[in-house]
């Protein structure tokens, strides 16, 4: 279980209120698919994923990225119970989709990069540390069903 300090919670929620979920979500999933191309196999139904520009412009990638980042909003509402907040998604990704749990960690790191590029100086080392802790906690919660 991940424990967040009051300062970490404030850093996470303070930044989250400024995140454009649609834009950042699409960019995060798109980057995951470009940087780690083997993850594309989970998205066969998304159509053209043949190049970075095709991926970044793909409406299905953008829509699913928004959905993924929206789930982080649920995590932020449940910082004290990430495992419970992601129980159903963990089951889906393990039992039905058979996603390698390492991909959750990769996506989390990409999300941190996206936030850093979007927020620049506002994304201080303390904010980054809090978000890194969050994405790690989410990755662990999503991988829970695998254990």
Curated annotation (Swiss-Prot):
GO terms for molecular function: haptoglobin binding; heme binding; hemoglobin alpha binding; metal ion binding; organic acid binding; oxygen binding; oxygen carrier activity; peroxidase activity. GO terms for cellular component: blood microparticle; haptoglobin-hemoglobin complex; hemoglobin complex. Keywords: Heme, Iron, Metal-binding, Oxygen transport, Transport. Heme b binds at residues 64, 93. It comes from the Eukaryota. Gene3D superfamilies: Globins. PROSITE patterns: GLOBIN (PS01033). Pfam families: Globin. InterPro entries: Globin, Globin-like_sf, Globin/Proto, Hemoglobin_b, Hemoglobin_oxygen_transport. Residues 3-147 form the Globin domain. Beta-type chain found in early embryos. PANTHER family: HEMOGLOBIN FAMILY MEMBER (PTHR11442), HEMOGLOBIN SUBUNIT EPSILON (PTHR11442:SF7). Belongs to the globin family. This is Hemoglobin subunit epsilon-1. The lineage of its organism: Eukaryota, Metazoa, Chordata, Craniata, Vertebrata.
């Amino acid at each position: 279980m991940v424990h967040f300090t009051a300062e970490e919670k404030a850093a996470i929620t303070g930044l989250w209120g400024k995140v454009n979920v649609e834009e950042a979500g699409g960019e995060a999933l798109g980057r995951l698919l470009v940087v780690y191309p083997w993850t594309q196999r989970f998205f066969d139904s998304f159509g053209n994923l043949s190049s970075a520009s095709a991926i970044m412009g793909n409406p299905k990638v953008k829509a699913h990225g928004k959905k993924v980042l929206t789930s982080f909003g649920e995590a932020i509402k449940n910082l004290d119970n990430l495992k419970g907040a992601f129980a159903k998604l963990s089951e889906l990704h393990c039992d039905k989709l058979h996603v390698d749990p390492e991909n959750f960690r990769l996506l989390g790191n990409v999300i941190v990069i996206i936030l850093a590029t979007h927020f620049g100086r506002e994304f201080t080392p303390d904010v980054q540390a809090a978000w890194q802790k969050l994405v790690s906690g989410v990755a662990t919660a999503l991988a829970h069903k695998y254990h």
